[in-house]
Each structure stands twice: as structure tokens, then as C-alpha cells.
Curated annotation (Swiss-Prot):
Name of the molecule in the record: DNA-directed RNA polymerase subunit beta'
Cofactor stoichiometry and binding remark: Binds 1 Mg(2+) ion per subunit. Binds 2 Zn(2+) ions per subunit.
UniProt record similarity statement: Belongs to the RNA polymerase beta' chain family.
Keyword Magnesium: yes
EC number: 2.7.7.6
Required co-factors: Mg(2+); Zn(2+)
Assembly, per entry: The RNAP catalytic core consists of 2 alpha, 1 beta, 1 beta' and 1 omega subunit. When a sigma factor is associated with the core the holoenzyme is formed, which can initiate transcription.
Enzyme class: transferase
Length: 1400
């Protein structure tokens, strides 16, 4: 008997595998899968409902309809299993074989597989080197194709029309073969000699210099080589046998009323079979050619529709006018097999309900309605009931549960204890969207949720619903408890800050408690302990806000974790003393002795977590919440209309603004300003007025005046309810209060442009009809935007997850010394993000050295925690090199040292952590908070562009970096480089501010000079661009022809005259060739060279340049030879928000990108063409690099100027590809991180840099081969970095030449599609193309990523699954076989075993 059970079990076991391979199926392969040929289009007999023989549901081919029963009913029961009935031919077995047995159709004429024909680039066309159009003409019987030209002048693969073919047949008779249809193409493919083609293509590639030809040949070569490597034959792309899907995968279901619901595939198969049978008949009848041809074409079309309906021509529709769902549609798209059934499955043991607040819960608990719990834990209850002997059978137990007997509730309590459940709120944007809690049984039907986890779930209680899931197995419960419990997810994985921050009511309550009020009851009292103060408060002897002195016991945790205890008297308030009562030991009193705003509370919890650990901080957070709720209730903070105090000065501010606007209108009317300028100025004036009103209003709201006994008034912080809500961070913001009590301000039109008439009213005064109408614009756009934003943000997250899903921490340390240089982020002189924040939780790549003494502060390889970061700050270190994922040398995955701290846990990252997915979630989750609009630079932005000096904000020493200067005749420094920067260093050697220095700026300080705050250190003219002489000599003006190339103009104000270069377009025929230039010569008239170069000092002058010197003037170093007026740079719309982030991650090329210098060297200009200028850079070795720049582009460099590789030479937006090519990976990383962070920072979202770096690593995982060496790669081919490095290692071991390469940047979509895993790529996008390509290449998926493993139904190789996979591999290596494999036993043996078992 045991034998039999094992035998039955073994059939269900699947063997373990390590990889999946996909390739083309040969006709013989298809026949070997098949259990018989489907010859008839019939499905089932409509009288008997039995499948027709040889039809699409035939039981003989596909297996019995019901278990162990043949169709005619002669054999029934298990004992006949394996018998084939001689009457109906059906094998007696399980009916589920109808899900796996395939059939086939022998096609009367070959048919091309549409995927290999139409999926671009067409594989068939590529192999045959013909055009897709030509091949289609052959396939659909429009022309003949020559297969074997014989001795005729024709060529193989040539197309012939009908008439042409007839003529040639008359002329040459049967010396040549030409055919039409799929047979012809199949013949061409079959007779190809792939090896010979490869040899010929390689020769042609080596023999040509044309880039396009090389590209074309390489494409073909790749295709043919992949065919050879995968043992696929080209002719298999043409089908001669068509496989038929098992019938239970295309079911036919009887509905009531005698009708049937059927899968579309059955219709499509029926069509194919009908046409195929008709074609067979016609061929037997020797029908006329034209009829046969038409039938063949129809067969081809019907097979096309079956494989991919609508790919060619019109889609075949069913009776309901809808296109039929073909095999391709089954697997692609959101509703396809991959995304609907393999990546997302429905699960059992789950329920969902509305959530309500559970203010009395502890952080690790949730309230679960009894009804739900009873249903969810049913199996556990049944087994317990049986175990206790309260029910004898499962059926009896079921009855008891349905009756809801009292014993059932007791057992439910027992089952639920210590059994966590998981709560999930859709949309699950990051891993904190699913957390585990211990259920507490409650009455009612709503789930109770702990208020502190609302932030993580992004939940509120206005009708949100949540789902409950029960982890069944012991392992699942263990994981839920140790990894997913709410108490283990205190920190946000995106930025490492606490995410269980109190919000709203709790903040309000704590803030209200901690405020001080002057002259409150009991002010100045002194208490011996906090308890005494509490007693006094409860008895009404002292007010909550009274300033009092309390004696407190404070325990502080020191550097090494040692605790120091002290007792001191502190000046505080009663409320703060009450808060101190619940604060755990180890937190200093001054953290509590402040107004408890949301930020202060967050700092408190963060500090508790870092110093006291998880347990203490969780208990503390809960206590804070209870306290906050109770005091918010007692405070009774609420507001009425009177609380929105409108500032007195509002009217005068508005009138002043209106006067200014009128003034501008007048200027415009008299033609002094353009309409654009007028509009910008008006918008500017109003936004300024708005800010003023807001400021005045907040000053009014935020201050109360208290009258002292002697009649004086003292100001104190206001207790206005609205102000308190905003100030505490509980609800609302200054901007919202401004609309309530200030003025609503400027509104935007739906296209994003600003309406220049603002809404001067506020909501308290009420809006006029016109103002209300204007404001509807903005409101409606806001709603439409939100809908779009959600979809776009979700799509961005999906792409990010897909590109990063296979990145896992795989080892502890890769041992690299490489890393990224980190410095504080400084913008416009202000520190945006200090170094401490940027490097926290990273590992040092080099020693951190004290800039003053040169001592090593921290060793390389040490983790920078909060203490280490403080140390760096104290010693004024402003530049450290830290390890980064981008520079990590681990082949597959990343090492823990390059990643650093796991932000969600606060310690070094564990091996097996899926950092890719976490990074994608961290970047994608705040996506919905980003804006969608593009910003129009108006008013303020365009004005601020005209800065003309640098005024330092702090005192210190000057440091110049990267700056090339010359000394002019006034003994001042003049900058002659563009990438120079000036920074101010304080006495500790810390960098305080940093500014860019433009070309031609005059510096009034030197390196190391001391400056005072407010001193102006650099000046320049923002409106013109100077040309500065770097040598001394006499000026010689060449090609200066008055009235032709230059014209004299005098300044009305000063009366000085100067010459202006005329635009070549406006010159006569004679002047077109002339090019005005200034040349410097010595006294003898010889050329002078620019120092340390071979280039003569001559400066070509562009159109519009103003020349202030005359021929023969003496020119000193640093003199200005000419000025080029800068039209203020054209205001481009800057893309902001979500679209900007998407553009950066997709690495899109911008429309008019900046042009960067290709090499380091000296600039000169060559011969101009009609619309472009030729810019030449001569490097140190004398090699010339040419760039053609359109004339309208603003070129920022001059003749003779020295540029560094990667420096901007024509303005525009930088393209990441250029940065990578010319400045390297580190620069690219810092550019992308900065740009992406700018967008998020604007919305106040904090994301750690390392998440962005993770995605960038994935964008950089491909390299382009520049020189294949002895490898099998081709020049220009893109391959995975890890594959290339492995290949190079192999070549080096064999002593051959390794391949040379350079990194390429791919956008996230492209990177996802070009991963090594075809399963992952196919489930992402463009399923057809990915699968087609993979099949031809015979790709093998090694199942390394997470997605592939989910799809094949295994544990993911990350987290706890990593151990499982490692163990499995070890087992396989040791050669342990889990089950002894025995061959399938034949039927006689089975019968014997059965007889023995049942002793028949």
C-alpha cells in the first residue's frame, strides 16, 4: 500500500532545475509533444455533450473527460487505470491530463510564424538579407522568389512578378527554380549555409569603413551567430506542424439555456483546421493554381491570427465585433499570463474591511473583528476542536463553528494568541504597506488600526479599507513576527528616520502641554519632584502652562554606552514635567524642555531609537501617543471665524502694489517695456505683495499681548488655535492660513501660466464672483493633475522595480578602495545638505584626515555612524571619499560594505537584503507627492539671473579652486577659466560657502586672503561677455572694413565711440568672406604665442562684438579686447516634478543639449559653413577635435582659450550620456543624484542618495565593446558588464588579448528590457519582441533575479530565500538526490500492487 501512495505522490513532484532555456521548436519536437492529430474542426456533440472524435476536444487524443472513466463507459474505476479502451480508444486515467496533453495539426502547406516575420526587426528578413515588404509579397502570393538561379543571370532571393516569371520560364525552361508562398521562404532558409555567411560577413565588416554598413552587417552577423550557437535551424521559423493547446486551457463551458461559452482560441483553431482541410482536398483534386494559392494565403492568415491576432492586417473579430484573443494576447499586457497569474496571485485566508482608529492599542496590535477572525482561522479551530475531543469529525467541527458555540470562542482566543496577522493597505507603494500585528478580538465589523502606523500605510479613517492575511506555516509566522512586525519597522527605509511619528491630534496635545503661558496660575512655584508637580496640577493648584522649577533625575548615555546620573533643578513648565514623566532614561532633559512641535517629537523618538534601542523607543512612542490623545481632548483646541485675524496693514500693501502695477502699465503704454517684461514684472509685484501680507499676518497671529499689573504690555507666543495647529505641525501650513486670513494670491491657468490679476480677498472676507471663477481654474486643474500623477508615479515605480529587482547584497566586502568623493551640497552660497547628512551610514573608502593636523581621524573601511559624523564635523572635514554601490566590484549583486547601513534597521546591511527593490520603492513611493507641471520661468527667476558680484556671508579665508587667472594692470586678478570656484573657509577649516566664478570676473582677493562677512570679493558685468588678452603686445585689427564688417557707433551718454561687428547675414557680397579678428604682435610685428602653447594670440570676433581698442594700441595682460553683449539667456521652460525625474532615469537626450569639450586643449575656429561654425580643440599632442556648432547657439569659449575635457562650450542642458563619456562615472553619478534630489527636495521629501545610486548602477550595467581583442564579441556590441569581465578573465588566463570597453548609460526601460533574464524582460514590456529574440538566441535564464523566481514559483533568492537557494545548490553539488528516481511502473505492476494492497 505504501508503495502505491509513494507512486501517486511521485507523479506530482517536479524535478528541481537551475535554469530555463527557450528555443525554436522543430517540427519533430512538436510531433513528439503531441498525443495525436486533430483532424476535424468539431468540438463537442451538441446532443450528447461528448467530445467529437478527432476534434478539438477529442478524448482519445487529450484524455478522459472524467477521472478514470473512458468515453463509452466500458472501463470505470481506479483498477483499470492505464488501460486503453478498445472501443473508444480513450486511456483510463486522471482527467487533469487534459490540461497537459497537446495535439497537433499537420499543415498541408508550410506557414510562416508571424512573430519571426513581423516582430521588428524581422528575424526572417534579417537572415535572408531581404526587405520585410519583399518577404511579405512572397508569403502572401504576390510575387515569385528565385531559390536556385542555376545558369541564368538571375540572383538568389530576387523577386519576380507573374508576367516576368512566365517570360523567364519560356526563355530558360527549368534551368532555374522560383516559387512563391511560405514553401519558397522555407526553401531559402533551409538552403542557407550559415557558416559560410558568417565568414563572409566578418570579411565584409573588416573591409569597410562605412559606419552604417558596419552596423547593418553586425546586426546580421549577431543574428546568424546566435542561430548557430543555439542549434536552431532557420527553417524552423516556418511552421509545417502546428501544436494544439490542451483543451482544458481553452475550455468550452455549457451555460444554462443550452448555450456555450468558449475560449476565443477554439474559434481560431477551428478556422485553421477548416482551411487546412479544404486545402488538402483542393490539392487532392489538383485544383487550378489560383484557387490553391488563395487557399494557402487564407491558411497563412488564419495561422497568423491564431498566433498573434491583429499583428498583420485587420484583426479577426468574433460574433460580438470584438477582436479574438490570440495566443500572444494571452501572455502579454496587464491581464496576460505573466502579470495577472504569475506575478500576482489571489491568496486564500484573507479578508478586508473598513479601518477605524484604535487609540488604546499597543504598537504591535490591531483590532480584528470576531466574525473575521472566526472565518480566517477556521482550519486551526477545526483541528483544535478535534484535538480537544469536542468534535469527532471535521464535519461536526464545522457545524459547531457555524452554530458559534461558546467553546468555539474560547478556542478562537487560544488559536489567535501569539499568531500574527498581516495588514495591507492598497496601494502598497513601499514595504511598509504590509505590516504584521498581533490580533486583539473586538466586537463590530471594522478593523482597528494603531494611529502611529498610519503614516507608513498612508492611511486615514475616512473610509479606507485594509486587507488581512494570515501567515499559515510556522516559518511564515516566524518571518512575520521577526521581520514584519510593526515594532520592527520604526525607521523608514527611504531615509532612515523614524516613520512612527505622532501626527495630528497627538502632536496637538503634546504641543499644547509643552507651551508656556506668562502669568499663569502658580507661576514661579518650585517642586521637589515631577510627581509633586503632577499632584499640584491635578488638584488645580497650578496651571498646565505655568513656568515652574522642578527637581528632575536625569540619566545620560555617554559615548561608550556608560550611563551618568544627575539630579538637577530645571526651569520648565508643568506640562513639560508631565511629558518628562514618560520619557525613558537616557534622554537629556533639554530635548523635552522645548515646544513639542512635530519636528521636536521626531527628534526625540529618533534619539531614543539610536541610544536606547527598539524596545524602549516603541514603549515610549506608545506612551507619547496616549498622553497626546488625552491632553488634546482636555485642551479642546478648536477654532471659529474670529480666529482668522486679518492683518490691519493688508489694504495698504495691496494699494501700494496696485500703484506699482499702474506705473508698469504706463511704461508699457509708452513703449518702454515689452509686453513680456510687463507681465513678468506684474507677476513679480503681486507675489511680493502676497509674501508681505503673509508675513504681516503671521506676525499678527503668532503674537499675543499680555498686560502686566503696572499697565505695560508684554508679547508672548500666541495661543490662537489656528496658529497653534500650524506652528505645531499638526495640521495646515502658513500657506493655507494665508488663504484663510491673508490673500489668496495669484492663480494659474490650466496650462500652468499665471493669471496676472491676483485674488486679493481671503476666505474669511469671501470671494467675489469673478475671483471665485478665477480660482475654479486652479482647483479643477489640481484634481485632473492628481489623477494623472497617480498613474504616472505608479508607472515610474514599476519601471524602477523592474530595473533594480535583481540587485541583492551577496557578499560582505568586495575589497575595493574605489568610491565617490562627498562634499557638502552648496547652492548659491548656502549649504543645502551638510556633509554629515550625506555620509551618515556609509563606509569610508580612504582614511578621513584632520585638515588642520593631518592626523587620521577614522580608518578606511570604518562605518560612519552618528558619532563618527560628529567627529568629522568637529574637525572641519569637508571632503571624504566613501564607498558606493556604483563603484562596487562585486560581479552579481553588491557587497555590504559598499552599501553601508540598512536604513530601515539602523545597522550594517545583511547579506541577502533586496536593496534594488527597496531603492525602487523609496524613489517611487513619494512620486505621488511630486508635481506634474512644467515651471515657466517668469519674473523672479529671470531677474535673479543677473547677479554681478559675490558677497560673502561669513568671515574666513578665501580658497580658490580650479581657477586660472592673470594679473591685470590694476594688479587685480582676472579669471580666464570657466569652471573656477571661490569658497570661504572658517577657522576650523570647514567650508562655509562656495560660488562659481564666471570668465572675465575681477577678483579683489587672493588665495588665502582674509575676508569679512558682507565683503564683495568678485565683480563682473552680467550683460556682456569679455574677451581677455592673456599676453602683452600691440593690437592689430584684421579685416576691419568700416561699413562692411564693422560700423562705428557712439554712446549717447559718454560720447565715446566704439566699433561693432556686423552680422555676416547683413553684409554685402564682398564682406561675407571677411572675418574680423584682433591679433597681438610684438614691436617688430611678429606673432605672439599664448603662453605654453603653439597657438598665436588672435581672437576672432563674433557678430555684435563691441571693440574698444584701436589698431596699434598697446595691450597689457588682462585687458579687455572686446565685449560680446549677452542677450539674457532665453527663458526655457524647466520641466519639474515627476516628468523631470522620469526624464533623468530614462536618460533622455534633451532637445538642444549643451555641447561639451571632447578633449583638453586650446580652442580655435575653422572655416564656417552656412548655418554652423566649426570649433576646433587642439590637444597637447596636437590632435584636432572638430565640432560643428549651429550659429544661433551661444558659444561660451573664445579663440585661444584653454578648455578642460567635459567643459561646457555651448550652453544648454547637460546630457547624462555626454557627462559619462567625457567626465566619467563619478561625475555622472553626482550629476544624476543632484538633479533628482533637487526635485524631491523642492517637495520636502527626503530620500537617501544611495537609493538613487543603486538605480544608477543598474543603468550602467551594460558596456560597449570598443575593441573585441581575442573575444567573440563584436565592436559596438553592448554586453553585460559581469559577462564581459568573466570573458576577459578567461582570456587573460589563456594568455589572449582581452576586450576593451567603455561604459554605456541606458534608461531604466531599456535597461530592464536588456537584462540577461528573458523571463523578467518579457514580463515587463514588449513581451513578443523579448520572447522572439530569446527563442532565436536560444537564451538560457539562470534565474538569478527575484522576478524570474516568482514567475517559476520558487522562493526568491533574497532574504530568507537566499539561504534556501544556497543550501539547494550545495545539495546539488554534493550530488545528493532527494528522491530515488524509479522508472514509471507499467500497468501490470500497478494492478499487482493494488491486488496486494486490497487483497483482491
Amino acid at each position: 500500500m505504501k508503495d502505491l501512495i509513494n507512486f501517486l505522490k511521485r507523479q506530482t513532484q517536479s524535478e528541481e532545475f537551475d535554469a530555463i532555456r527557450i528555443s525554436l521548436a522543430s517540427p519533430d519536437m512538436i510531433r513528439s509533444w503531441s498525443y495525436g492529430e486533430v483532424k476535424k474542426p468539431e468540438t463537442i456533440n451538441y446532443r450528447t455533450f461528448k467530445p467529437e472524435r478527432d476534434g478539438l476536444f477529442c478524448a482519445k487524443i487529450f484524455g478522459p473527460v472524467s477521472d478514470y472513466e473512458c468515453l463509452c463507459g466500458k472501463y470505470k474505476r481506479l483498477k483499470h487505470r492505464g488501460v486503453i479502451c478498445e472501443k473508444c480508444g480513450v486511456e483510463v486515467t486522471l482527467s487533469k491530463v487534459r490540461r497537459e496533453r497537446m495535439g497537433h495539426i499537420e499543415l498541408a502547406s508550410p506557414v510562416a510564424h508571424i512573430w519571426f516575420l513581423k516582430s521588428l526587426p524581422s528575424r526572417i528578413a534579417l537572415l535572408l538579407d531581404m526587405q520585410l515588404r519583399e518577404i511579405e509579397r512572397v508569403l502572401y502570393f504576390e510575387s515569385y522568389v528565385v531559390i536556385d538561379p542555376g545558369m541564368t543571370p538571375l540572383t538568389r532571393g530576387q523577386l519576380l512578378g507573374e508576367e516576368e516569371y512566365q517570360k523567364l520560364v519560356e526563355q530558360y525552361d527549368d534551368e532555374f527554380t522560383a516559387k512563391m508562398g511560405a514553401e519558397a521562404i522555407r526553401e531559402l532558409l533551409r538552403t542557407m549555409d550559415l557558416h559560410a555567411e558568417v565568414v563572409q560577413l566578418r570579411e565584409e565588416i573588416n573591409g569597410t569603413n562605412s559606419e552604417t554598413k558596419i552596423k547593418k552587417y553586425t546586426k546580421r552577423l549577431k543574428a546568424i551567430e546566435s542561430m548557430l550557437a543555439s542549434n536552431n535551424r532557420p527553417e524552423w521559423m516556418i511552421l509545417t506542424v502546428l501544436p494544439v493547446l490542451p483543451p482544458d486551457l481553452r475550455p468550452l463551458v455549457p451555460l444554462d439555456g443550452g448555450r456555450f461559452a468558449t475560449s476565443d482560441l477554439n474559434d481560431l483553431y477551428r478556422r485553421v483546421i477548416n482551411r487546412n482541410n479544404r486545402l488538402k482536398r483542393l490539392l487532392d483534386l489538383n485544383a487550378p493554381d489560383i484557387i490553391v494559392r488563395n487557399e494557402k494565403r487564407m491558411l497563412q492568415e488564419s495561422v497568423d491570427a491564431l498566433l498573434d491576432n491583429g499583428r498583420r492586417g485587420r484583426a479577426i473579430t468574433g460574433s460580438n465585433k470584438r477582436p479574438l484573443k490570440s495566443l500572444a494576447d494571452m501572455i502579454k499586457g496587464k491581464q496576460g499570463r505573466f502579470r495577472q497569474n504569475l506575478l500576482g496571485k489571489r491568496v486564500d485566508y484573507s479578508g478586508r474591511s473598513v479601518i477605524v482608529v484604535g487609540p488604546t492599542l499597543r504598537l504591535h496590535q490591531c483590532g480584528l473583528p470576531k466574525k473575521m477572525a472566526l472565518e480566517l482561522f477556521k482550519p486551526f479551530i477545526f483541528s483544535k476542536l478535534q484535538f480537544r475531543g469536542l468534535a469527532t469529525t471535521i464535519k461536526a467541527a464545522k457545524k459547531m463553528v457555524e452554530r458559534e458555540a461558546p467553546e468555539v470562542w474560547d478556542i478562537l482566543d487560544e488559536v489567535i494568541r501569539e499568531h500574527p496577522v498581516m495588514l495591507n493597505r492598497a496601494p502598497t507603494l513601499h514595504r511598509l504597506g504590509i505590516q504584521a500585528f498581533e490580533p486583539i478580538l473586538i466586537e463590530g465589523k471594522a478593523i482597528q488600526l494603531h494611529p502611529l502606523v498610519c503614516t507608513a500605510f498612508n492611511a486615514d479613517f475616512d473610509g479606507d479599507q485594509m486587507a488581512v492575511h494570515v501567515p499559515l506555516s510556522l516559518e511564515a509566522q516566524l518571518e512575520a513576527r521577526s521581520l514584519m512586525m510593526a515594532t520592527n519597522n520604526i525607521l523608514s527605509p527611504a531615509n532612515g528616520e523614524p516613520i512612527i511619528n505622532p501626527t495630528q491630534d497627538v502632536v496637538m496635545g503634546l504641543y499644547y502641554m509643552s507651551r508656556e503661558r506668562l502669568f499663569a496660575k502658580g507661576e514661579g512655584m518650585t517642586f521637589a519632584s515631577v510627581d509633586e508637580a503632577e499632584q499640584a496640577f491635578l488638584n488645580g493648584a497650578v496651571d498646565l502652562h505655568a513656568k515652574v522649577v522642578v527637581r528632575v533625575r536625569e540619566v545620560v548615555v555617554g559615548e561608550g554606552g556608560e550611563r551618568t546620573e544627575s539630579i538637577k533643578r530645571v526651569q520648565t513648565t508643568v506640562g513639560r514635567a508631565l511629558i518628562w514623566n514618560i520619557v525613558p532614561e537616557g534622554i537629556p532633559f533639554e530635548m523635552v524642555n522645548v515646544d513639542m512641535t512635530k519636528k521636536a517629537i521626531s527628534r526625540l523618538i529618533n534619539h531614543a531609537y539610536r541610544t536606547l534601542g527598539i524596545k524602549a523607543s516603541v514603549i515610549f512612542a506608545d506612551q507619547l501617543m496616549y498622553l497626546g490623545f488625552s491632553h488634546a481632548t482636555r485642551a479642546g483646541v478648536s477654532f471659529g471665524v474670529e480666529d482668522m485675524e486679518i492683518p490691519v496693514r493688508k489694504d495698504e500693501i495691496i494699494q501700494a502694489a496696485e500703484r506699482e502695477v499702474k506705473e508698469i502699465q504706463n511704461q508699457f503704454a509708452s513703449g518702454l517695456v515689452t509686453d513680456g517684461e510687463r507681465y513678468n514684472k506684474v507677476v513679480d509685484i503681486w507675489s511680493h505683495a502676497n509674501d508681505q501680507v503673509a508675513k504681516v499676518m503671521m506676525e499678527g497671529l503668532g503674537v499675543d499681548e499680555v498686560t502686566v499689573g503696572n499697565g505695560e504690555t508684554i508679547k508672548q507666543k500666541s495661543f490662537n488655535s489656528i496658529f497653534m495647529m500650524a506652528d505645531s505641525g499638526a495640521r495646515g501650513s502658513a500657506a493655507q492660513i494665508r488663504q484663510l486670513a491673508g490673500m489668496r494670491g495669484l492663480m494659474a491657468k490650466p496650462d500652468g501660466s499665471i493669471i496676472e490679476t491676483p485674488i486679493t480677498a481671503n476666505f474669511r472676507e469671501g470671494l467675489t464672483v469673478l475671483q471665485y471663477f478665477i480660482s475654479t481654474h486652479g482647483a479643477r486643474k489640481g484634481l485632473a493633475d492628481t489623477a494623472l500623477k497617480t498613474a504616472n508615479s505608479g508607472y515610474l515605480t514599476r519601471r524602477l522595480v523592474d530595473v533594480a529587482q535583481d540587485l541583492v547584497i551577496t557578499e560582505d566586502d568586495c575589497g575595493t578602495t574605489d568610491g565617490l568623493q562627498m562634499a557638502p551640497l552648496i547652492e548659491g552660497g548656502d549649504v543645502v545638505e551638510p556633509l554629515a547628512e550625506r555620509v551618515l551610514g556609509r563606509v569610508l573608502a580612504e582614511h578621513a584626515v584632520d585638515p588642520a593636523s593631518g592626523d587620521v581621524l577614522l580608518e578606511a573601511g570604518s562605518m560612519l555612524d552618528e558619532r563618527a559624523v560628529q567627529l568629522l564635523e568637529q574637525h572641519g572635514v569637508d571632503n571624504v571619499r566613501v564607498r558606493s554601490v556604483i563603484t562596487c566590484k562585486t560581479r552579481y549583486g553588491v557587497c555590504a560594505s559598499c552599501y553601508g547601513r540598512d536604513l530601515g534597521r539602523g545597522h550594517k546591511v545583511n547579506i541577502g537584503e533586496a536593496i534594488g527593490v527597496i531603492a525602487a520603492q523609496s524613489i517611487g513611493e513619494p512620486g505621488t507627492q511630486l508635481t506634474m507641471r512644467t515651471f515657466h520661468i517668469g519674473g523672479a527667476a529671470s531677474r535673479s539671473a543677473a547677479i554681478s558680484n559675490v558677497e560673502v556671508k561669513s568671515s574666513g579665508q578665501i580658497r580658490l579652486t580650479n581657477l586660472k587667472t592673470v594679473v591685470n594692470r590694476d594688479n587685480a586678478l582676472v579669471a580666464v577659466s570657466r569652471s573656477g570656484e571661490i569658497s570661504v573657509i572658517d577657522e576650523h577649516g570647514r567650508e562655509r560657502e562656495r560660488y562659481k566664478i564666471p570668465y572675465g570676473a575681477v577678483l579683489s582677493v587672493r588665495e588665502g586672503g582674509a575676508v569679512k562677512a558682507g565683503q564683495i570679493v568678485v565683480n563682473w558685468d552680467p550683460h556682456t561677455h569679455p574677451v581677455i588678452s592673456e599676453v602683452r603686445g600691440r593690437a592689430k585689427l584684421i579685416d576691419f572694413v568700416e561699413g562692411v564688417t564693422v560700423r562705428e557707433q557712439s554712446d549717447e551718454m559718454t560720447g565715446l565711440s566704439s566699433m561693432v561687428v556686423i552680422d555676416p547675414k547683413q553684409r554685402g557680397g564682398a564682406g561675407k568672406e571677411l572675418r574680423p579678428l584682433v591679433k597681438l604682435v610684438d614691436e617688430e610685428g611678429n606673432d605672439i604665442f599664448i603662453p605654453s602653447t603653439e597657438i598665436t594670440a588672435q581672437y576672432f570676433l563674433p557678430a555684435g562684438a563691441i571693440i574698444g581698442i584701436r589698431d596699434g594700441d598697446l595691450v597689457e595682460v588682462g585687458d579687455v579686447l572686446a565685449r560680446i553683449p549677452q542677450e539674457s539667456s532665453k527663458t526655457r521652460d524647466i520641466t519639474g516634478g515627476l516628468p523631470r525625474v522620469a526624464d533623468l532615469f530614462e536618460a533622455r537626450k534633451t532637445k538642444d543639449p549643451a555641447i561639451l569639450a571632447e578633449a583638453t586643449g586650446t580652442v580655435s575656429f575653422g572655416k564656417e559653413t552656412k548655418g554652423k561654425r566649426r570649433l576646433i580643440i587642439t590637444d597637447a599632442s596636437g590632435e584636432q577635435h572638430e565640432v560643428m556648432v549651429p550659429k544661433w547657439r551661444n558659444i561660451t569659449v573664445f579663440e585661444g582659450e584653454h578648455v578642460e575635457q567635459g567643459e561646457t562650450i555651448a550652453e544648454g542642458e547637460l546630457t547624462p550620456h555626454d557627462i559619462l563619456r567625457l567626465r566619467g562615472t563619478a561625475e555622472l553619478a553626482s550629476y544624476l543624484v543632484k538633479e533628482i534630489q533637487d526635485v524631491y527636495r523642492l517637495q520636502g521629501v527626503k530620500i537617501n542618495d544611495k537609493h538613487i545610486e543603486v538605480i544608477i548602477r543598474q543603468m550602467l550595467r551594460k558596456v560597449e565593446i570598443t575593441d573585441p581583442g581575442d573575444s567573440s564579441f563584436l565592436r559596438g556590441e553592448q554586453v553585460d558588464r559581469s559577462r564581459l569581465l568573466e570573458e576577459n578573465d578567461r582570456l587573460e588566463e589563456e594568455g589572449k588579448v582581452p576586450a576593451c570597453y567603455e561604459p554605456v548609460l541606458l534608461g531604466i526601460t531599456k535597461a530592464s528590457l536588456s537584462t540577461e533574464s528573458f523571463i523578467s524582460a518579457a514580463s515587463f514590456q514588449e513581451t513578443t519582441r523579448v520572447l522572439t529574440e530569446a527563442a532565436i538566441r536560444g537564451s538560457t535564464d539562470r534565474l538569478q533575479g527575484l522576478k524570474e523566481n516568482v514567475i517559476v514559483g520558487r522562493l526568491i533568492p533574497a532574504g530568507t530565500g537566499l539561504a534556501y537557494h544556497t543550501e539547494r545548490r550545495e545539495r546539488a553539488k554534493l550530488g545528493e538526490v532527494t528522491e530515488p528516481e524509479t522508472p514509471i511502473i507499467d500497468t501490470a505492476e500497478v494492478e499487482e500492487a493494488l491486488k496486494q494492497a486490497f487483497s483482491l
